[in-house]
């Protein structure tokens, strides 16, 4: 069993920001996006930035009250994977009788995704979906039996919708994708200066290589991280 690691600095202070682009959110301003919304979608909206882990999200509201979410993807997200996400939304909406699923609002050309360039030259994909108001599950109470049954049913329906997507999950190179662990760790292990910690990492990687890697091609690969 690997003992707990005490809190200490393992990487240089600016390491994450400067070397791991998939963890960097886009940095578009409201001033950048308001004219872009009108140009691409023909909409005149006010914008308010929303929380986001790897993507940049904005609440977009028209004067007539119609509300949307403008999503700017991380520069590492591929068009193929985002198209699969849209496909999953559409299939889920068809199967969920009582569910509310965000619907994509196409641009003037009828496209669900538009390419945009940031000031630093990075390419991002932009899409607009209708906003769905609601309460986060963590803030909703009580979690009654009926509520949990409905939640489980919804998760099962979404799983069924994803199973109907004809293709295999697109290949990704995110840090937390286990099928990329070998190349990821080989790239970033030189930054680990603590010899004891480095030993644990190498031993874990060796164990993975000997026991899991030979079986990977036989295992099913999911579309999502299962962190619902």
Tell where the protein language model's regions lie, with residue ranges.
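Juxta-kinase regulatory segment immediately upstream of eukaryotic protein kinase catalytic domains
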Residues: 9-43
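Broad phosphate/nucleotide-binding scaffolds in NTP-utilizing and phosphate-metabolizing enzymes
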Residues: 10-24, 56-68, 72-84, 101, ...
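An alpha-helical support segment within catalytic cores of ATP-dependent transferases
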Residues: 29-37, 164-167, 183-226
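ATP-binding glycine-rich phosphate-binding loop
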Residues: 42-58
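Active-site acidic catalytic loop and adjacent metal/ATP-binding pocket
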Residues: 53-64, 69, 104, 209-228
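A conserved alpha-helical element in kinase catalytic cores
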Residues: 72-123, 140, 145-149
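A glycine-centered beta->alpha junction motif in the catalytic cores
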Residues: 110, 122, 126-140, 183-191
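A cross-family kinase active-site recognition segment
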Residues: 140-197, 219-221
């Amino acid at each position: 069993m690997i003992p707990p690691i005490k809190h200490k600095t393992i990487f240089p202070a600016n390491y994450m920001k400067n070397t791991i682009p998939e963890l960097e959110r886009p940095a578009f301003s409201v001033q950048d996006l308001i004219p872009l919304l009108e140009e691409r979608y023909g909409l005149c909206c006010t914008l308010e930035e929303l929380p986001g882990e790897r993507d940049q999200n904005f609440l977009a509201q028209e004067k007539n009250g119609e509300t949307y979410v403008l999503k700017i993807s991380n520069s590492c997200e591929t068009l193929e994977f985002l198209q699969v996400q849209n496909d999953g939304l559409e299939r889920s909406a068809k199967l969920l009788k009582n569910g509310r699923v965000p619907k994509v609002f196409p641009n003037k050309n009828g496209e669900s995704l538009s390419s945009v360039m940031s000031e630093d030259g990075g390419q991002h994909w932009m899409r607009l979906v209708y906003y769905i108001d609601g309460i986060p599950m963590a803030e909703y109470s009580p979690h009654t039996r009926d509520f949990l049954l409905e939640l489980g049913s919804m998760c099962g329906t979404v799983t069924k919708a994803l199973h109907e997507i004809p293709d295999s999950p697109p290949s990704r190179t995110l840090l937390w994708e286990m099928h990329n662990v070998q190349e990821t760790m080989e790239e970033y292990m030189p930054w680990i200066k603590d010899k004891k910690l480095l030993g644990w990492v190498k031993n874990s990687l060796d164990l993975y290589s000997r026991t899991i890697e030979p079986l990977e091609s036989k295992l099913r690969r999911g579309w999502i991280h299962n962190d619902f």
